[in-house]
Swiss-Prot record:
It is found in: Cytoplasm; Peroxisome membrane. The keyword Lipoprotein applies. The gene is PEX19-1. The modification Cysteine methyl ester is found at C245. May be farnesylated. Dimer. Interacts with PEX10 (via C-terminus). Interacts with APEM9. Expressed in roots, leaves, flowers, siliques and stems. Highest expression in stems and flowers. GO terms for molecular function: identical protein binding. Keywords: Coiled coil, Cytoplasm, Lipoprotein, Membrane, Methylation, Peroxisome, Peroxisome biogenesis, Prenylation, Protein transport, Transport. The keyword Coiled coil applies. This is Peroxisome biogenesis protein 19-1. Residues 22-108 are annotated as: Disordered. It comes from Arabidopsis thaliana.
Amino acid sequence: MANSHTDDLDELLDSALDDFKDLNLSHQRNQREAQEEEEKKRKEETVLLPSGVQGLGMGLPDMRSKKRGKQKVSKEDHVAEALDKLREQTRETVKGLESISSKQLPASDDDGMVEDFLKQFEDLAGSKDLESIVETMMQQLLSKDILHEPMKELGARYPKWLKENEASLSKEDYKRYSQQYKLIEELNAVYENEPNNSSKIMEIMQKMQECGQPPSDIVKEIDPGFDFASLGQISPEMLESSPNCCIM
């Protein structure tokens, strides 16, 4: 009788243990599924920017679409770290643009211009949402003072290159490069006639995303060491937590 009672108790304990294991596994599975669903949702809501070298304008945040509401910039350490990285990479971008421009800025203006950019950026960080900060920074980097001369240098080489290479290019590539040239000309016209029309400038740069990189021959002729995809990769996520900070 005692043995029977002990066996029943053992079976009850084993059953309870099995139920506990099932409950624990089910809880872990549900927790994992919830985390995966949250990650999937976050990725769908976030505007991901291309990380590789894709083309003129590639990496510009799409200001025509609304992101996840208005986000306030955190005042934690990673913001300061991101700003430090942004300062250095912005300086490199400006210097790269100067290297391909026939009308170079005085050397003394270089660091001062970059510091002005970042000072404005830091001032905004404590008071505005991320989308506004990104837009302000892009307006600075895409301004006439920074981008007009390099775009003139670039556009001036297209007519000859298109004529010399039309026979060897596919119809698709020729059409793409021709559209690229058209957009560069449009951008230069805005710089000459409406230099403060930042929304138009940004709209044209957005369209350039679809045209890829400029012809490698032209890039090598202007400055083989400069990456045209460095003209503006900025994302709100970079200021929030990303360890990799990049400008276009």
